Every structure is written in structure tokens, then in C-alpha cells.
Amino acid sequence: MARKTPIEHYRNIGICAHVDAGKTTTTERILFYTGLSHKIGEVHDGAATMDWMEQEQERGITITSAATTTFWRGMEAQFPEHRVNIIDTPGHVDFTIEVERSLRVLDGAVVVFCGSSGVEPQSETVWRQADKYHVPRMVFVNKMDRAGADFLRVVDQIKNRLGANPVPIQLNVGAEEDFRGVIDLIKMKMINWNDADQGMSFTYEDIPADMIDLAEEWRNHMIESAAEASEELMDKYLEEGELTEAEIKQALRTRTLNNEIVLATCGSAFKNKGVQAVLDAVIEFLPSPSDVPAIKGVDEKDNEIERHADDNEPFSALAFKIATDPFVGTLTFMRVYSGVVNSGDAVYNSVKEKKERFGRIVQMHANKREEIKEVRAGDIAAAIGLKDVTTGDTLCDQSHKVILERMEFPEPVIQIAVEPRSKADQEKMGIALGKLAAEDPSFRVETDDETGQTLISGMGELHLDIIVDRMKREFSVDCNVGKPQVAYRETIRGKAEVEGKFVRQSGGRGQYGHVWVKLEPSEPGEGFVFVDEIVGGVIPKEYISSVAKGIEEQMNSGVLAGYPVLDIKATLFDGSYHDVDSSEMAFKIAGSMAFKKGALEAQPVILEPMMNVEVTTPEDWMGDVVGDLNRRRGMIEGMDEGVAGLKIIRAQVPLSEMFGYATDLRSATQGRASYSMEFNEYAEVPKNFADKIIAERGY
């Protein structure tokens, strides 16, 4: 089959935002105007097409990023048909992992802000993640019909709080109840959408007389930003004072793709105003797969190689999401970076080093699906029938192996024990947890060796609530849930050189492993680093990886209170072996003995998760809120002015002090304050608290 849509006409975009900015409604309207969903779904009624898991419809927040394919030809059918793949991303703090995962496979993003509440803490997180993956983006300031909506104030916040360079290409006409439409600064016309047909039709009108000066001022700002794209344009602009519409668009596109500017548009998705203009901007200013740099990966020999968005290159794709579907089993969402693959073809999972076969390939539309015969470079689709693929694995052509970069996933910060209510639930719970863990790398399952309890850990209380809820709904598992526990960690602050010697002689073949290891802290966040400095074969090559394995396994339970150990550098520098008695097992045990001994000598400490907490409160209660955060061992980092005279307090607080905070804050401020919290880093626990933790663990 030939390619239906040229790759230049693809747009793979994400729609990202803070919780109530109206992202799902915006996506819904996009689906409506592109002709896919005939009745508009409202999140308030729990009926939005993109939010396809039951819990999302109940809670009215988006949890899983569903991928949807739509087609668009422009508000005035001015473009050839473009294929737009949309990934809807969650905006709740506990699901930051989903956002990270979807940004990884996108080419561009539309970031939605609320016209009245503007840039909120989670928006900053999403913005930083998009910076990390160099995703070109544009902004849609939504909810212009809300009380307190102010487009230019939000543009100002994007500049000052996010350090971005926003360039408005529209202005709003009226705001709050009087919001009527937008001014297109490129055409210098007002766009007026028709309320009678849900904004399907629109007219261009003259700009209201009282807005002409403001429109001229912002148009000049936009043209100056465009002229900075090249010296030729700047010279032309300085000489003639004007650029053509085509020149402006081309220049704004170039600068957006280079991540130099962020174009800003506005509207109200709920009131059906402005969404089609966002779609037009996606086509005109955001990249196609061939506009973004080739994806880098490594081949079998660890040499760096690139894969370009081209059907003629070998097949390569990244699995970015695993979802369990009650009807077809496991759906593996993938972004195809190069080549072509047909349903029924064999492919290779280069991370797991296993062959896989695509049973069927489906294109998703939120929760409906259409079977397709093949996928090509630039496509986003889901495969059915893959046996052992987890998030972040690479699928590729077997004779051209490549591993595309792995995604990094955060350490979970909160843990609860779950117990099945009956014998029948026991087995079902194991299966359910296994499937849920395959879908979500920020969720872990382990068994406590001492108590035999099953522990699940994740990114926050809501995250784990939803996991327990899904076990009940999707796998009908009833379980009792323990009290949330903090996921503490351990590390070392000092250095130690230690000997680990494992010798056993008792008739027949003995055991002999002997190592000298230097332990020291590695860089924060670097994890376990193993350095082999053995010279002259004092330990044979084949035993060295066993020493590393022994140390790494022992790091699962630390020496102070049995918590996993982070950020250790271990250097193996000496040792000895026995011709007959040495084995991999003996060296593994010697490695773990050395670690146990060394960790005790190298100033071991307990670490706790520190959270970035932002509290928004009326001024009257500010003193109480700050006092309460100080009592919770919080460090106040700063205060900002919020909207409508509210104050925003930023602090770092240990997670262990934040349980039940929502209730305490509500009662202290008569329900007027709100807060958000996300993981920042692991930090050392003060000595008196550490002693308490060690005593509680019975060490």
C-alpha cells in the first residue's frame, strides 16, 4: 500500500495542562470539529470521549493518555488534508509520569492554561518536562468566558514564571460574560463564531474601534518577533515596516520549531470559540515528524545511530504505553519513528532481546478502534498480541537492531500494604497487580520478606487509590488497604574500603570468593555505579559481574532499617580466587558481604521524600498556614501574589508530615485554601527522626 498522507502533513501533538484548565473539553471540541464525535461530550456530565476509564469519568480528571487520530483541512478548507494524532495527557500531579511518557513521543504540544487562574504549579512541571524533551509548543488560553479571565495577564505569567518567550497571534474581544470572539493579528480581522451551530461556522468582521490601537501594538510585537528569524527579514522589516502574511507565518513557524518562541492563542472551548483556530495554528506552526531531529539510539555494539522519519529506513518504534482492554487483552501503544510494518509481521524487542509478532494493529479514537493493515513512519497506533513489552521498550526490524533511548521513571514515594479479603482474591490480586505494573512504570509491587504482606508503591495517594479501585472494577479483586507509609531510602555519606570473604569447606567441592571493594556515594540520582579495577587477573573476568550483582541485590535492603539504598559507587580493586572452589555464587555472596560491612562503616543515613508544596490561601489565614507548615518541618521558600488577592506559599515539606494535610488545611481556613504537592527529591532525615524510624522497623 502506498502512503495515504504525506509525512509532511502529519502532526503528532499532545494537549497538556494543569488540572482544571479545560484540556479534555478542548480535545473534545477538536474531535467534534474534525468530524469524529457527533455529540460534544462534557466533562461535567462525565461523558467526554477522551476520558475512557470509568474512574476518570467519575472524578472528572484525565488519567490515561489515550491516543486519537483525526483529520483536518483548515477552518476554510485552505490546507490539503492533514492527519493529526492527538495524545491527551493527564494534568494531575500524581500522574506526571504519563505526561513525561507522552511528551517523549510527541513532535509538538498545545499547552492549555485557564484564563483566570493562569500559570499554576502543575503547569510549571509540564513545561519543564516539555523543555527536557525540546518539544516545540504553542499556548491556548482557555476559559476566557470565566470570571477574572485576562489573556494578557496569563501571557505575562508565561513569560515571568516559565521563563518562556510568548508571542500572542490573537487577542480576545471582550472577556468573562462579554467574551465574543478573537482578533487574528496576522489577518487583522475579528473572528466571530456562530453560537447557533456550536461554533461550526464563523465570519470575519472588522476589529472593534476601541481595540484597534491595542491590536496594532500586539501585531507589531508579533512582526518584530517574526523578523528575528533571519537577517534578511529583519532588514526588510526595518526598511519597509511590514512583512507579508506568508513571510510572517513562515518566520513564526521557524522560530517555534527552534523553541525560540511560543505562540499564544485564546478562546473558550466550552463556549465553542477559538478551537478551530488552534487547529489551524497546529497545522501552520507545529512540526511534522520530518521537521524534528532524527531520533537517536544505539546498536548492538553500543554505537550511536539515528533513525529518520522515512518509510525506506528499517522499522523502529517506541512502546510508550501499555493498556489492558477487557475485550482484546493488552494494547501496546507505539510511536513509529521509521520504516513500515504490517499486521502479522514479526518484529524484535531489542530491550528484552525477544521476538514479537503484531497480531493486529489498530488506530485508536479515544475508546473506539479501527483495524489497519500497516503503520508507517510518523504513525501512532496500538498493537494487539504482543507478549512481553513494557513501557519504553523499542520494537525494531530484526536484521537492523536498535535501542531508542530509554525513558527515566521516578522513584515512588508512598507505599501501602494490600491484603486480599479471601483465598479466591489472593490469586486474582497477583494477576491484577502484575498487569497494572506493566502498564505503569511509576507503580511498583513487592512483598515484604518479614511480614509476607504485599506492598504497592506509587507517586501519591490518588495514584494508589486509583490502582486499588481498578483492581476492584477491572479484575473484581476485593482487598483491604493499610495505612499509607512513606517510602524511605538509605544511602551513605562517607567512604569505606572493605573485604568480603566467603569460604566454605565441608567435604567435596568447597566455596571460595574473596573481594576488596571501595564504597563511596555516587552523584545524586546516578543510582548504582560499579567500577572494575581488577588488574592481572586476580579475579577472573567471568566472576566480576557476579560481584556487582551481589552488591546490587544487597542494596535492596539497607543496613540501618532495611530500606532500599540509593546512589552508591562500588569499586572492585582486589581479591583472590581458588581454581576449584570458586564459583559465580561464591563471588556474589562475597560481594554482598562486602557491601553490608562497608555500608555500616561509610556513615549510612536514612533519606525521606521531600515534596514541593504550594498552598493558595486568602491573606487572613496566611500566618496560620505558614505556622502549620513550619510545625511540619517545612522550609518556606517564597510567597507570590495569586489572583483575586490570594497568596501563594511555596515550601519544601517531608512527605511523612503531609498525611491528612487536606483535611487539616480545610478546617484551618474554613475550606478557602487549596494546595498541590509533588515529589522534589530525597533528603537526609534528621537524627532524632531517623532513630525513631529505625526503632519502629525493629533494627
Curated annotation (Swiss-Prot):
<dbReference type="GO" id="GO:0005525">
    <property type="term" value="F:GTP binding"/>
</dbReference>
<dbReference type="InterPro" id="IPR041095">
    <property type="entry name" value="EFG_II"/>
</dbReference>
<dbReference type="GO" id="GO:0032790">
    <property type="term" value="P:ribosome disassembly"/>
</dbReference>
<feature type="binding site">
    <location>
        <begin position="17"/>
        <end position="24"/>
    </location>
    <ligand>
        <name>GTP</name>
    </ligand>
</feature>
<dbReference type="InterPro" id="IPR005517">
    <property type="entry name" value="Transl_elong_EFG/EF2_IV"/>
</dbReference>
<dbReference type="InterPro" id="IPR035647">
    <property type="entry name" value="EFG_III/V"/>
</dbReference>
<dbReference type="Pfam" id="PF03764">
    <property type="entry name" value="EFG_IV"/>
</dbReference>
<keyword id="KW-0547">Nucleotide-binding</keyword>
<dbReference type="InterPro" id="IPR005225">
    <property type="entry name" value="Small_GTP-bd"/>
</dbReference>
<dbReference type="InterPro" id="IPR004540">
    <property type="entry name" value="Transl_elong_EFG/EF2"/>
</dbReference>
<comment type="function">
    <text>Catalyzes the GTP-dependent ribosomal translocation step during translation elongation. During this step, the ribosome changes from the pre-translocational (PRE) to the post-translocational (POST) state as the newly formed A-site-bound peptidyl-tRNA and P-site-bound deacylated tRNA move to the P and E sites, respectively. Catalyzes the coordinated movement of the two tRNA molecules, the mRNA and conformational changes in the ribosome.</text>
</comment>
<dbReference type="Pfam" id="PF14492">
    <property type="entry name" value="EFG_III"/>
</dbReference>
<dbReference type="InterPro" id="IPR035649">
    <property type="entry name" value="EFG_V"/>
</dbReference>
<dbReference type="InterPro" id="IPR014721">
    <property type="entry name" value="Ribsml_uS5_D2-typ_fold_subgr"/>
</dbReference>
<dbReference type="InterPro" id="IPR009000">
    <property type="entry name" value="Transl_B-barrel_sf"/>
</dbReference>
<keyword id="KW-0251">Elongation factor</keyword>
<dbReference type="Pfam" id="PF00009">
    <property type="entry name" value="GTP_EFTU"/>
</dbReference>
<dbReference type="InterPro" id="IPR027417">
    <property type="entry name" value="P-loop_NTPase"/>
</dbReference>
<dbReference type="InterPro" id="IPR000640">
    <property type="entry name" value="EFG_V-like"/>
</dbReference>
<dbReference type="InterPro" id="IPR031157">
    <property type="entry name" value="G_TR_CS"/>
</dbReference>
<dbReference type="InterPro" id="IPR047872">
    <property type="entry name" value="EFG_IV"/>
</dbReference>
<keyword id="KW-0648">Protein biosynthesis</keyword>
<keyword id="KW-0963">Cytoplasm</keyword>
<feature type="binding site">
    <location>
        <begin position="88"/>
        <end position="92"/>
    </location>
    <ligand>
        <name>GTP</name>
    </ligand>
</feature>
<feature type="domain" description="tr-type G">
    <location>
        <begin position="8"/>
        <end position="290"/>
    </location>
</feature>
<dbReference type="Pfam" id="PF03144">
    <property type="entry name" value="GTP_EFTU_D2"/>
</dbReference>
<protein>
    <recommendedName>
        <fullName>Elongation factor G 1</fullName>
    </recommendedName>
</protein>
<dbReference type="GO" id="GO:0003924">
    <property type="term" value="F:GTPase activity"/>
</dbReference>
<feature type="binding site">
    <location>
        <begin position="142"/>
        <end position="145"/>
    </location>
    <ligand>
        <name>GTP</name>
    </ligand>
</feature>
<dbReference type="GO" id="GO:0005737">
    <property type="term" value="C:cytoplasm"/>
</dbReference>
<dbReference type="GO" id="GO:0003746">
    <property type="term" value="F:translation elongation factor activity"/>
</dbReference>
<dbReference type="InterPro" id="IPR004161">
    <property type="entry name" value="EFTu-like_2"/>
</dbReference>
<dbReference type="InterPro" id="IPR000795">
    <property type="entry name" value="T_Tr_GTP-bd_dom"/>
</dbReference>
<dbReference type="Pfam" id="PF00679">
    <property type="entry name" value="EFG_C"/>
</dbReference>
<comment type="similarity">
    <text>Belongs to the TRAFAC class translation factor GTPase superfamily. Classic translation factor GTPase family. EF-G/EF-2 subfamily.</text>
</comment>
<dbReference type="InterPro" id="IPR020568">
    <property type="entry name" value="Ribosomal_Su5_D2-typ_SF"/>
</dbReference>
<keyword id="KW-0342">GTP-binding</keyword>
<dbReference type="InterPro" id="IPR009022">
    <property type="entry name" value="EFG_III"/>
</dbReference>
<dbReference type="GO" id="GO:0097216">
    <property type="term" value="F:guanosine tetraphosphate binding"/>
</dbReference>
